[in-house]
Every structure is written in C-alpha cells, then in structure tokens.
Amino acid sequence: MKGRAEYVYARVLVDLVKDNSEEVSAGIRSLLCACEDRDVRAFFVDPTVPFGVKVAALRDVQKACALDDTLVSFVCVVVEDGLFASLGGIFEKFFALLRRKLGKFNLEIISAAPLTEKEESKILRMLRAQYGDPEAIIRRTDPGILGGFVAKGDTFTVDASYVGQLRELTRISKEAVFSI
C-alpha cells in the first residue's frame, strides 16, 4: 500500500506543478538534501511536535531556500497526513512520472551476456517507439536470465528473457491443467 500511496501523492504533485516543473524539481532536490539529516527526519516524524511548528519550520526553509509555494504546501499536506517518512519515495515517483510526461525515462538493460552494439540498438529502437527516449541507460549482465534481455524503465518492465518466457509457459500450463 505504501508504494501505491507514494504514487498517488506523486501524481498529484505532477498535476500541481504543470509548467513549473524545473523550479519545483530544483526545490525537491534541495529538500531531499535537507531531509538526509537524521535530526530533520526525526523532527518531522515526531508525533509530539505540533503540526503548526512543522509548518512554520517548512515556511522558514521556503524563505531561506526560495522554494516554490506549491511545493511547500504539498509537503505540508504530506507531513499532516503523517507520511513524511515516505517523502523520498514520493519524490522518486514524481521524477519518474515527470520523465514519463516528457517522454523520457531511466533504463536498465539486463542481459545474460554483454550485448553487441547491434543487439542494443535493436532493443533501444523498440523501446523508443513504445516509451520515448531513455535519459540514462545502465547495462548489466545476469547469467541467471539464461538469454534474451530484461529492460526496466521507470514505469515499465519488458521481460524478453528465457527465464521470463519459461515462467510464462509455466503459468499458462498451470491455467490449462486447472481449467480441465
């Protein structure tokens, strides 16, 4: 449920910022840096600290760092809802949704052995046609997938591995057997 709640909050933030995404993204990065401090996290998750005190602290940070009002108001809602501990996950999903909105995504390509340029080019062509341009590509090998590839984007996974195909055949076989 936590992941779903993070997604919903991130979706709301994407809708709120609309054309102001660059300024808000910079503000989020500043907030994430501040939230890395253990004392800051402890302050915002402490149920004995009144909500008004937390809001005042956020407004002080807003003034000091020139943060967007929409962003700070959004964080106030997250704090009020008791989800400050999920803020990092919310922002991570926000960036993924924003990249998706812009036709971009982070991509990880996993193959059993290193891909040739031709193989990688073919995979990227297919993914670009369906999802847009990857912003960053991470390549790694995992002999455990036996062959083929797995492409993981921010919001999608394409499993064209042999292990994935075997898993799908197993699922279909079980359905066929149990439906008799």
Swiss-Prot record:
Q: Which domain of life does the UniProt lineage start with?
A: Bacteria
Q: Where in the cell is it found?
A: Cell inner membrane
User: How does the protein associate with the membrane?
Assistant: Peripheral membrane protein
- Tell me the SUPFAM superfamilies matching this sequence: N-terminal domain of the delta subunit of the F1F0-ATP synthase (SSF47928)
Residues of the signal peptide: none
Its function, per the record, reads: F(1)F(0) ATP synthase produces ATP from ADP in the presence of a proton or sodium gradient. F-type ATPases consist of two structural domains, F(1) containing the extramembraneous catalytic core and F(0) containing the membrane proton channel, linked together by a central stalk and a peripheral stalk. During catalysis, ATP synthesis in the catalytic domain of F(1) is coupled via a rotary mechanism of the central stalk subunits to proton translocation.
Q: How does it assemble?
A: F-type ATPases have 2 components, F(1) - the catalytic core - and F(0) - the membrane proton channel. F(1) has five subunits: alpha(3), beta(3), gamma(1), delta(1), epsilon(1). F(0) has three main subunits: a(1), b(2) and c(10-14). The alpha and beta chains form an alternating ring which encloses part of the gamma chain. F(1) is attached to F(0) by a central stalk formed by the gamma and epsilon chains, while a peripheral stalk is formed by the delta and b chains.
Give the family this protein belongs to, as stated in its UniProt record: Belongs to the ATPase delta chain family.
Q: What is this protein called?
A: ATP synthase subunit delta
Q: Which gene encodes it?
A: atpH
